[in-house]
A protein has these predicted regions:
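N-terminal secretory signal peptides that target proteins for export/translocation
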Residues: 1-17
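Bacterial N-terminal signal peptides
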Residues: 22-33
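Boundary at the C-terminal end of the N-terminal hydrophobic targeting segment
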Residues: 38-40
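Mature N-terminal, pre-catalytic/accessory segment of carbohydrate-active enzymes
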Residues: 42-55, 61, 67-72
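Extracellular ligand-binding/catalytic regions of CAZymes and related secreted enzymes
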Residues: 44-46, 123, 231-273
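Helical hinge/lid and interdomain linker segments adjacent to catalytic or ligand-binding clefts
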Residues: 62-147
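Class I SAM-dependent methyltransferase SAM-binding "motif I" and its flanking Rossmann-like core
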Residues: 143-185
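Catalytic beta-strand/loop cores that center a nucleophilic Ser/Cys/Thr
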Residues: 168-239
Length: 273
């Protein structure tokens, strides 16, 4: 009787455990493929959108700010406006891109607003993977510096290039710009050209004036990237009426959107120095 009871109990335990084991194996079979898929997925960006931080404080140009903001929104980023440069270090934490666009004719006072602490915060942000876009006055700010009436104005040095006026005239014009191999009629007003200096970071020359001088370029900065342009690819059609000669102007906004998207991308700056 004891043996029979033991046998019966063992049989009962075995038969009762079959569905439990089957359920366990079925669950494992379902979980394992999911685990494999999870491991094969790319890592999710913890800050997938961020924002573009656009400087709108003293010396900046409101029309340029408005045009750049429209371009950045087309490129898929929300825009946050920064009117006090002292707040820059704190605002960079959530920014994917920092922008300085067109400015007043005298951009040197803006350079002087960058204290060592502000400049250091911006350079750390870039070296850790941040982005900077400078157009016209903002491109001067990002350069190594420029000569001005016998003096040399030292700028931030975000790109390995010195800057200089293209034509020494502050009146708005339409110039032929060879942008990525295609000649475009583009708005220009006292923006810089660039002369590359010896450096270790890769640089890609994006555009040229008709005399062959560099009009726009992109450079690596540590893990980050910097793009600068003397002419204004973001200019809307309404700006044409302001130009000195009233020449025709191409619609270049798609080029500006493409520039922002390329700057934001993870693709490296491919042309080595």
């Amino acid at each position: 009787m004891l043996s029979n009871r033991h046998f019966d109990f063992h049989a009962l335990r075995s038969s009762a455990s079959r569905p439990v084991r089957w359920l366990l194996w079925s669950t494992l079979l379902m979980i394992c493929p999911l685990a494999g898929k999870a491991q094969s997925q790319p890592q999710i960006d913890t800050n997938p959108t961020g924002y573009a931080l656009l400087y709108t404080g003293p010396i900046s140009d409101p029309d340029s700010n408005e045009a750049i903001a429209a371009v950045v929104k087309q490129a898929g980023l929300p825009v946050v406006y920064l009117d006090n440069l002292d707040d820059l270090p704190a605002r960079l934490a959530g920014a994917r891109l920092f922008i300085i666009g067109g400015t007043e004719d005298d951009v040197e006072p803006l350079v002087h607003r960058f204290t060592p602490a502000i400049t250091g915060a911006l350079k750390r942000y870039l070296s850790q993977g941040g982005r900077y876009l400078g157009i016209c006055g903002g491109a001067f700010v990002a350069s190594l510096g420029w000569a001005d009436e016998g003096n040399y104005v030292k700028a931030l040095g975000l790109v390995p290039a010195e800057s200089d006026d293209y034509d020494g005239d502050f009146s708005p014009k339409i110039h032929d710009i060879r942008w990525l191999g295609e000649v475009r009629r583009m708005y220009y007003q006292a923006g810089p050209t660039f002369a590359l200096q010896p450096g270790t970071e890769p640089v890609r020359e994006l555009a040229y004036f008709d005399d062959g001088r560099i009009a726009a370029l992109m450079s690596a900065y540590g893990r980050g990237k910097v793009a600068v342009s003397g002419p204004h690819p973001e200019a809307p059609a309404s700006w044409k009426a302001e130009t000195q000669d009233g020449d025709t102007m191409d619609t270049n906004i798609p080029l500006a959107v493409q520039l922002v998207q390329e700057l934001l991308s993870d693709r490296p700056v491919l042309t080595p120095r």
